[in-house]
């Protein structure tokens, strides 16, 4: 007698169990995201000394605080905020995001804030430190200048606020001429009228004849570009020193 294969369908109870497991996993992920957000907010509101003391206490006991009930921590945090509101000025709202292991508080910026201050705060990686606000109409502070107005030198480092201008290219009106070489005169060979003219050369022959001329023209452009770059040698020297100090 041959064995008979019997197809067993999943019961409603197994499907309900699978759904409950999926709901539990999604709930854990949701609570984990809330916990991560709250931990980031707490780290943003603490000083580096508090964070160091907390890490030392965890390392000494070998236990970490329980995170099974995030709603209790939210309630405690709400009570602390209410206490701050009653006892002193309330802390301003924060919106801290973490991008590539660096955090920045976006609540301190408005919609019209340029991108550069936001990037500068992100590079600083200190969400608790706020950028100094400056009204759009207020003028920029004057730059410290010396006799030439190009740089300031103190005892520790060298702060450069303005690069020196390039050297003069020559007589007045020769600025463009310093970048563009003088044209190379064509080489013409006159033939007597009584001699018969040569037949028209092929394209390969013309390319071969003009190859040397093209090489000379390209070399003249390279020399003119090099001479023009020498006018900025002082600026390049300052930039090189700034790069080497990093």
UniProtKB/Swiss-Prot annotation:
The modification Phosphoserine is found at residues 135, 138, 182, 202. Transmembrane segments: none annotated. GO terms for biological process: G0 to G1 transition; gene expression. One of its GO terms (cellular component) is transcription repressor complex. There is a cross-link at residues 5, 7 (Glycyl lysine isopeptide (Lys-Gly) (interchain with G-Cter in SUMO2)). Keywords: Acetylation, Isopeptide bond, Phosphoprotein, Ubl conjugation. Residues 39-55 have a biased composition (Basic and acidic residues). The modification N-acetylmethionine is found at residue 1. Residues 39-90, 129-208 are annotated as: Disordered. GO terms for molecular function: protein-containing complex binding. The modification Phosphothreonine is found at residue 167. InterPro entries: LIN37. Component of the DREAM complex (also named LINC complex) at least composed of E2F4, E2F5, LIN9, LIN37, LIN52, LIN54, MYBL1, MYBL2, RBL1, RBL2, RBBP4, TFDP1 and TFDP2. The complex exists in quiescent cells where it represses cell cycle-dependent genes. It dissociates in S phase when LIN9, LIN37, LIN52 and LIN54 form a subcomplex that binds to MYBL2. This is Protein lin-37 homolog. It comes from Mus musculus. The gene is Lin37.
